[in-house]
Amino acid sequence: MSDRLAVLPQYLLPKQALTHFAGFVASRERGWVTTEIIRRFVAKYRVNMSEALDSDIASYLTFNDFFTRALKPGARPLAQAALVCPVDGAISQFGAIEHDQIFQAKGHHYSTTALVGGDAALAAHYQNGHFATIYLSPKDYHRIHMPCDGRLTRMIYVPGDLFSVNPVTARGVPGLFARNERVVCVFESARGPFVLALVGATIVGSMATVWHGVVNPPRGKAVREWRYPASGQPEVVLRQGEEMGRFLLGSTVVLLFPKGPLRFNPDWEPGRAVRLGEAMADVAADSQR
């Protein structure tokens, strides 16, 4: 079966209603029922609970509490690299941005402008730059961390669809990551600006950041934007490896970096499993002379 045919049912499903229902159920305390759901989930997806800060599944009051579980200190050491991987997951794609086009899958590209919600001036910073797209499967740790030190300057909520973001859907739905609901976070770093976008999906109840809390719901039809620092509030500065947000059920992150001598980890390739804290990219050695 072709990828386009495989994703056809997703066009027909009531994705918003399913996602709302999943979020409702996942946030409710149901005692032994919750524990049994978690137990079955752990068994089905082979979740490694030994690395969780709390490995006792009966201690989680809701499925969301389990899904956003913390890791034990030292479970994800940081590599010595300019940029470290911000999540556990699998590489969807990475590489150069061609003018303003990001490669999604064979035959599919989407623009940086579309990804960030139509702001052409913001997108222009990443023309001919670099990108990385990482998919978080249900078994993965679902907190998102900083690839490098950064100071938050903007956050943009972009309403959209709620297609699944698994590899089959990425190959079958044009412009998937610029089509789905997303939260675009813009940071300033020592090497210039960068974007870390959290892309929603079917059953993803919500996305949250450490400085704002839950961004969605409520879901709306209009782009919403926040500028930082907010009036009367201190700057939001996060260090490399520090948590910046989380998914309540899994999805995808897309990172954008400006044009420059960035060299991705030579071991990286599409489909490869990656872990939070491993080396993602460094500045090319010849540019430091």
Swiss-Prot record:
Site feature location: Cleavage (non-hydrolytic): G250, S251
UniProt cofactor note: Binds 1 pyruvoyl group covalently per subunit.
Sites bearing Pyruvic acid (Ser), chain numbering: S251
A Pfam family the protein falls into: PS_Dcarbxylase
Enzyme class per UniProt: lyase
Catalytic residues as annotated in Swiss-Prot or TrEMBL: D88, H145, S251
Any one biological process term the GO annotation gives: phosphatidylethanolamine biosynthetic process
Domain of life: Bacteria
Annotated GO CC locations: plasma membrane
EC number per UniProt: 4.1.1.65
Keywords: Cell membrane, Decarboxylase, Lipid biosynthesis, Lipid metabolism, Lyase, Membrane, Phospholipid biosynthesis, Phospholipid metabolism, Pyruvate, Zymogen
PTM comment text: Is synthesized initially as an inactive proenzyme. Formation of the active enzyme involves a self-maturation process in which the active site pyruvoyl group is generated from an internal serine residue via an autocatalytic post-translational modification. Two non-identical subunits are generated from the proenzyme in this reaction, and the pyruvate is formed at the N-terminus of the alpha chain, which is derived from the carboxyl end of the proenzyme.
GO molecular function: phosphatidylserine decarboxylase activity
Membrane topology: Peripheral membrane protein
Pathway participation: Phospholipid metabolism; phosphatidylethanolamine biosynthesis; phosphatidylethanolamine from CDP-diacylglycerol: step 2/2
Cofactor names: pyruvate
Cell location: Cell membrane
The reaction(s) this protein catalyses: a 1,2-diacyl-sn-glycero-3-phospho-L-serine + H(+) = a 1,2-diacyl-sn-glycero-3-phosphoethanolamine + CO2
Family membership noted in the UniProt record: Belongs to the phosphatidylserine decarboxylase family. PSD-B subfamily. Prokaryotic type I sub-subfamily.
Quaternary assembly: Heterodimer of a large membrane-associated beta subunit and a small pyruvoyl-containing alpha subunit.
Function: Catalyzes the formation of phosphatidylethanolamine (PtdEtn) from phosphatidylserine (PtdSer).
Name of this protein: Phosphatidylserine decarboxylase proenzyme
Naturally occurring in which organism (per UniProt): Polaromonas naphthalenivorans (strain CJ2)
Gene name of the record: psd
